[in-house]
Structure formats: structure tokens, C-alpha cells
Amino acid sequence: NPELSLDLVYNPGGAFLPPPQASLEQDYREMLGREFGITFSSLLAITNLPVNRFAHSLRRDGQLEDYQQLLVDNFNAGTVSALMCRHLINIDWEGRVYDCDFNQMLELPLGGGKNRHLWDLNPQGLEGKDIATERHCFGCTAGAGSSCSGELA
């Protein structure tokens, strides 16, 4: 059905940054179309952040510090204005609020303070708020950046 959209998500299969989203999309369009007759709307390239299972895997393989340094070394200031944590919040099933879904996984509350619930927030009070950050945040700013909608820069 041409009215439906199909978006593919590319996550690197290891401790490296994704290639440029546009070239990946072109390569996948050509190969999937030629080999399987598959067409899709867009491809989103997302960086693996070193949290939970991926961090455990990196630690187990002795790659955690090297991968973290790769993210730091590839910091791109051009991604900062488009970071999701600057424009959105994440809410868990109990109403607790976080700066992003990765901070939720790490149990880092909104702004790095005490746990807050959605019903206790004033939306206007969120403008210019502090954002809880740790080393995993470099994953969203490395290279072309990363978000739920793919590259940022």
C-alpha cells in the first residue's frame, strides 16, 4: 500500500559509529529493491549508546573505554541544538519524568535532581531547565548525531 510508510532503522553492529545516513539509505534502497523487491520510505541511522546491555557487552569485550573515547573524540557541536533532551521529556509508566529514554534506563531523573512526576510539573517551568548528563550523552552528539529520527546534523 503506497499510503503506508516503512522506515528502516540502522544500528551499528559493534563499537563504531554509523556511516552517513544518506549513503546507507541509498545502498539499502538499491540492494533491498534489487534482491527482494522491497521499497521503503526512509532509513534512520542511530548510534549505539553505551548503556545497559550494550555497555555490558563492551565491558565484557574490553571495549567500553575505547568506545566511550570514540564518542568523545567525535563530538559534534552542530548536533547540540537538535538534541531530543533539549525539546522533549520522557515519562515512565508511573509518571516519573526524565530528560530522555536513556536517562530513564539509567534512572537519572529530570535535571539530575530528585524524582519528579508529570502531574507535579509546570510545562512553562521546563523551558531552559537543567538536563541530567553523563558520559553516555556523547552518543547523541558524536559524528552526525543521533535521535529517534536518525541523524541530527
Predicted features by range, described:
Residues 24-28, 53-55, 91-94, 98, ...:
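Aromatic-residue detector
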